[in-house]
Design a protein with these regions (language model features):
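A ligand-binding cleft/hinge motif common to bilobed small-molecule-binding domains
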Residues: 140-142, 271, 277-294
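Periplasmic-binding protein-like
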Residues: 162, 167, 180-181, 245-251, ...
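Early extracytoplasmic/lumenal segment of secretory-pathway proteins
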Residues: 41-137
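A bilobed periplasmic-binding-protein/Venus flytrap-type ligand-binding module shared by bacterial periplasmic
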Residues: 184-191, 228-230, 307-322, 338-342
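Mature extracytoplasmic/periplasmic domains
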Residues: 313-382
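Extracytoplasmic ligand-binding site segments that recognize negatively charged/polar headgroups
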Residues: 72-87, 106-115, 127-274
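Conserved C-terminal helix/tail region of periplasmic/extracytoplasmic solute-binding proteins
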Residues: 43, 376-411
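Bacterial lipoprotein signal-peptidase II cleavage site
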Residues: 27-36
Length: 411
């Protein structure tokens, strides 16, 4: 989801982050096996293999096809810099392929909506309403299970695939555009200095001063994975997760003023002083801090379960060439680290979410170079210090306990 930054004194966050992180190996995640595509055609000199359509095209043919497609629809999150992102992509296509295209960039904090629409279109024999989905990894895994995901890797239109570590790829069906995203708690370190663990949200001093995620999607899911770890519960067992929900509702519930994942609401409540803490994505702490709210701090869970964004192309996408162009652009170092875009530092910190591989390390901007590793892990830490999630198990059981959570809070 929409990611933003954590905030503590320089150099202290990195130490806190990784002192608490559970070292359990690389971020390879358990996920359903992708269905194989047809054998790739053999292209001659001067041609590029274009996946999804499985055709060979010259550069001129690619340009003509992009002009013919004319645009694409991407399902993502609610970045504050979405308008700039749209403009930058459209300018890139014009400069690279000579075509004027329209990027429709949809945003939501409830990405399950995308799968619902894709499944309905597939069942009805209709074209997919999206050309690219760019949300958390668990939705890709669910999409594969439902038969909604196209094979598209490798493709000559996506040379930037080679820049991304294997642990962030599920070829042939998806590739990460984030490496360090996870749900956490953003809090005011002056008003709530006692917050050290997720269980500390039960402190009576926070009565009426926090928000928790609304049930149903990965923001709530990620929060409860972290809380389950603190309570010694197994997130793969729905009965144990219901116990985690019961604990949260009983102990944290009296402090909750609202259950929501609406980002503008969360930020308005926090910035006005109406709340002292909210459960949302780690990047929001960065956004608050760089926006001038220097007391905004990230509570890092003792066990970090990453929920990174992954790019994939739905079956039935009607603009498959532009979909691949967008994915390649999104993976480029210049977009992963949008240093030349006309955006504020807080917006930059939303769009950039860690290194995908060694070729990205040199792109940290000068204005952030001295403090970058106070807010982000090193590439080696990214490779080794996050706990992978069994998304098959999560997807198989989460609806049961998420529905239970909804019932317990009256939603």
């Amino acid at each position: 989801m929409h990611r933003n930054n954590r905030v503590t004194a320089p150099r202290t966050i990195a130490a806190l982050f990784f002192a608490l992180a559970l070292v359990v190996g690389a971020c390879n995640t358990a996920a359903p096996a992708a269905s194989g595509g047809g054998a790739a055609v053999t292209c001659t000199d001067g041609q590029k293999h274009v996946s999804v359509t499985n055709t060979c095209m010259t550069d001129d043919q690619i340009k003509a096809e992009i002009a013919k497609e004319g645009g694409l629809v991407v399902g993502n999150w609610t970045y504050s810099a979405n308008a700039v992102l749209i403009d930058e992509f459209q300018k890139y296509v014009k400069a690279t392929y000579g075509a004027d295209v329209k990027l429709t960039y949809e945003g939501t904090q409830a990405p399950s909506e995308y799968l619902t629409k894709l499944a309905a279109a597939s069942k009805g024999g209709n074209p997919a309403p999206y050309d690219v989905i760019a949300v958390e990894e668990n939705y890709w895994a669910d999409g594969v299970t439902q038969g909604l995901v196209s094979d598209f890797l490798p493709s000559d239109l996506i040379p930037n695939q080679k820049l991304v570590l294997d642990q962030f790829q599920h070829a042939p069906t998806s590739i990460a555009f984030q490496s360090t995203a996870f749900p956490g708690v953003v809090y005011n370190k002056t008003k709530a200095p006692f917050l050290k663990t997720l269980k500390d949200l039960a402190n009576p001093a926070l009565k009426g001063k926090i928000t928790l995620p609304a049930p149903g999607d990965i923001t709530a899911g990620g929060f409860f994975l972290g809380l389950a770890s603190e309570l010694g519960k197994d997130y793969k067992d729905p009965a144990q997760m219901k116990e985690v929900v019961d604990w949260a509702v009983t102990n944290i519930g009296p402090n909750v003023v609202q259950y929501t994942t609406d980002q503008p609401t969360l930020q308005q409540l926090f910035e006005s002083g109406a709340i002292d803490a909210f459960a949302f994505w780690n990047s929001t702490a960065r956004l608050e801090y760089f926006g001038g709210h220097k007391d905004a701090t990230l509570l890092v869970p003792g066990t970090i379960y990453p929920a990174n964004g992954y790019l994939w192309i739905p079956k039935g996408a009607t603009h498959p060439v532009l979909a691949q162009v967008f994915i390649n652009w999104r993976l480029s170092p210049e977009v992963q680290f949008p240093n030349d875009w006309p955006i504020e530092h807080g917006q930059w910190s939303e769009l950039s979410e860690g290194f995908l591989g060694p070729d990205y390390v040199s792109h940290v901007p000068d204005w952030f170079a001295a403090d970058y590793f106070s807010y982000f892990p090193t590439l080696d830490q990214i490779k080794t210090q996050f706990k992978p999630v069994d998304w098959n198990a999560y997807n198989a059981t989460s609806k049961e306990w998420q529905d239970y959570y909804a019932t317990k809070i009256g939603q």
